[in-house]
Amino acid sequence: MDIQTRIKELRKQINEANYLYHTKDQPIISDFVYDGLMRELIELETKYPEYDDETSPTKKIGGVVLDAFKKHTHTVPMMSLSNIFNKEELKVFYDRIQKVIPNTSFTTELKIDGLAVTLIYEKGIFKKAATRGNGVVGEDITENVKTIKTLPLQLSKPLDIEVRGEIYMSHKTFKEVNLERANSNLDLFVNPRNAAAGTVRQLDSKVVAKRRLDLFTYTVVGASNFNSTQKETLEFLSELGFPVNPHYKLVDNLDALSDAIDNYDILRKTLPYDTDGVVIKVNQFEHYETIGYTAKYPKYAGAYKFEAEKQITKVEDIIFQVGRTGVITPVAVLTPVFISGSLVSRATLHNEDYILNKDIRIDDQVLVHKAGEIIPEVIEVVLGSRTNQAPFEMVKHCPACESNLVRKQGEADYYCANDNCPGKNVFGLIHFASRAAMDIDTLGEKVVELLHDQTYLQTIPDIYKLHTFKDQLEELPGFGKKKVEKLLNAIEASKMQTLDRLIFGLGIKNVGAKVAKTLLNHYPSITLLADAKYEDLIQIPDIGPEIADSVTTYFSNESNQHMLEELKNLGLQMTYKIDVVTTHPFNGKTFVVTGTLDDFSRTEASDIIEKLGGKVSGSVSKKTDYVLAGKEAGSKLTKALELGIEVMDEATFKVKINE
């Protein structure tokens, strides 16, 4: 057998093994044999580059390292589906469609909890993959998606086709990846979806390949050009070699639809991957235009959302955390329980009133869920299992410094009033260094906690004295010369941050980033702001009595005055200047910023627009000139497209601001 024939034979064997193992769950060769075939193919392709082929399974190994992701404009927007939250809403959805198209049938498909992706093929050869992004513009993640073993690099037919699907990470892989990260002292991923999203955004495709992402496809762009129904489309995708979730069904009445959802709710708890609902679509494509669309969603489809998962567990203890403003938050320490894709061992109890209203006690059995599928929360006590648990009593002293706690009239929270409280200081230091405030790279939560424990950081000015401990810092666990140098450079650079960031970073109660700017627009230096009178502050638009009281209280405190003087002497900016560029193309233009941007927060983008003479509004109207849209942009983007307003993605924004 000649070399070229052997290479083709190896590719065929490996592709067949990949398909049967990853798509059909039917392994035909052992891992040992598979690895041997792959090694042989890699060696032959390396030795004989003239036989290189972009569809070779060796392309899934990874190896391309990118500087950044390129933007990709979708030929057809990747928009969302409307949510259906209960059986009553399901009936409304069903009846509305039946009025337009009587006796229509529906497909039901599991909604995979992952990352949406579009896949582009030319003459049956995989060419490009892109994320959803803001629905109009996504990111090119081709090299990373190539590493997914269930992705066909060559289809069974030479078609020009665009296919959409969901990238996800299995429970097994998720546990393995987090174990590796724990052993490397890295932050753990919160859940498989978070892990999949983080992996897809890796610039090094070798890292992606090691994390073993997976894929399900569910539709074709312009599907009616290939088939007449959604069911046929799913079968068609499978025939082409795409992985398709096998648990789809065809139903023809409301009872069958309701039963299917109930069955999916049972099934999903046994699956090796996460799901977060059921996608329901009218089966016949010919009815889509008749049924129509809203401004944001197609009317012929919806996503039934499973009720938030709840679990019963035990309250082992109630502890108290000190926030950066001194707020004392009670937290339930729970017997660990798996909820919605992650292990939950703590849950917020909000405040004393919340605990007393629900009568939560240590040793109680409680029902826990994730609020918004994110934040663990105790929702009720299982009273039938209670024995002799003592009623909850709020602590009277700060858990960090033992100072007396205070509760202001009309407020639910208790506060530690000690300005030098170490617990408050840790959170205050973390906030000060955060991206939204002074943006000190490398000085994250864990580093702050370590330096605080080692007594290098107790106050904000201590941050700017860390250079005097350079040699000692290099000896700390997880540090070293390069990391310390990077940290100290970031600290030095932060001295040039604008005064509004400093004011926000100080953690003054009720003073967020926007309020800080508003205050400085009227008192453009630390001295002027410190001398501002309560009665003058409340005359400023958007500055009410609570903010005015917080500001005057903060600046009248002698310890705070000394700290600010120290920061001034250390070289931080103490005056505020807005340089409005009246000749810039943004001058006089009204913007709306929506979605999540990669390199800016929405506040940062708004700051740039305003400094270039533009105005930032909170809502889209006919008076809006531009909508700056990031990922997961929702109704504001939809309205902009309806009104014909120019939509600007982040890449264009970066170019424009330098004009």
Swiss-Prot record:
Query: Does the record bear NAD in its keywords?
Result: yes
The alphabetical list of record keywords is: DNA damage, DNA repair, DNA replication, Ligase, Magnesium, Manganese, Metal-binding, NAD, Zinc
Q: Where is the BRCT domain?
A: 581-659
Example GO BP: DNA repair
Q: Name one Pfam family in it.
A: HHH_5
**What EC designation does it have?**
6.5.1.2
* Annotated protein name in UniProt: DNA ligase
Recorded catalytic reaction(s): these are: NAD(+) + (deoxyribonucleotide)n-3'-hydroxyl + 5'-phospho-(deoxyribonucleotide)m = (deoxyribonucleotide)n+m + AMP + beta-nicotinamide D-nucleotide
Source organism, top-level taxon: Bacteria
